[in-house]
């Protein structure tokens, strides 16, 4: 998206989040098993049809709340922090639930590095901290963190489409993806079939 956020402020807030919030997958299953998750709004789909409401962790993160509620001009639904450890892969998959057909997924990279690749629809992207990205999670997508030592942390939020958010998408640079045979080989591991969680 043609907007950015203050990544240093976000990192400072998240660093102060009590450690008790971390250490689980936040109810996420399947291809998401490698990542830790802290839900800020709503619950993982695998936990059932639970209400989309603020969770306790969000009360510790006023700047992230501002990003969710004021910076993106649309109604927020589920939001989470997703920590992908070094050397991990989120296998390419398609999010199929009806919920995903009604929402737009936005990524806020908090920490990342040059060895993290987001795959989507046959192209690979590097999402840098402070940038804000839209991801078509109804298409094949996955993540490779090729550095065994460094993790990647994103805030991932789903929003209901609004005219203002659609206008931001229209102004976005859509030519940033590239083919990368090495990344795709590691993501797919010789398989061509996508997972459907």
Q: What do these predicted regions represent?
A:
Residues 1-72:
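Non-heme Fe(II)/2-oxoglutarate
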């Amino acid at each position: 998206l043609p907007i950015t956020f203050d990544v240093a402020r976000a990192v400072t807030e998240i660093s102060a989040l009590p450690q008790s919030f971390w250490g689980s997958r936040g109810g996420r299953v399947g291809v998401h098993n490698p990542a830790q998750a802290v839900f800020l709004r709503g619950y993982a789909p695998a936990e059932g049809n639970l209400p989309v409401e603020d969770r306790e962790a969000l009360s510790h993160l006023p700047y992230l709340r501002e990003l969710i509620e004021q910076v993106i001009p649309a109604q927020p639904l589920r939001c989470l922090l997703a920590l992908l450890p070094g050397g991990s892969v989120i296998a390419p998959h398609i999010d199929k639930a009806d919920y995903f057909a009604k929402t737009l997924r936005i990524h806020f990279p908090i920490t990342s590095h040059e060895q993290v690749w987001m795959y989507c629809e046959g192209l690979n992207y590097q999402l840098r901290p402070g940038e804000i990205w839209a991801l078509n999670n109804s298409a094949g997508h996955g993540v490779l963190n090729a550095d065994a030592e460094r993790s990647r942390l994103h805030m991932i939020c789903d929003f209901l489409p609004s005219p203002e958010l659609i206008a931001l998408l229209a102004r976005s640079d859509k030519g940033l993806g590239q083919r990368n045979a090495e990344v795709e080989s590691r993501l797919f591991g010789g398989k061509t079939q996508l997972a459907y969680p």
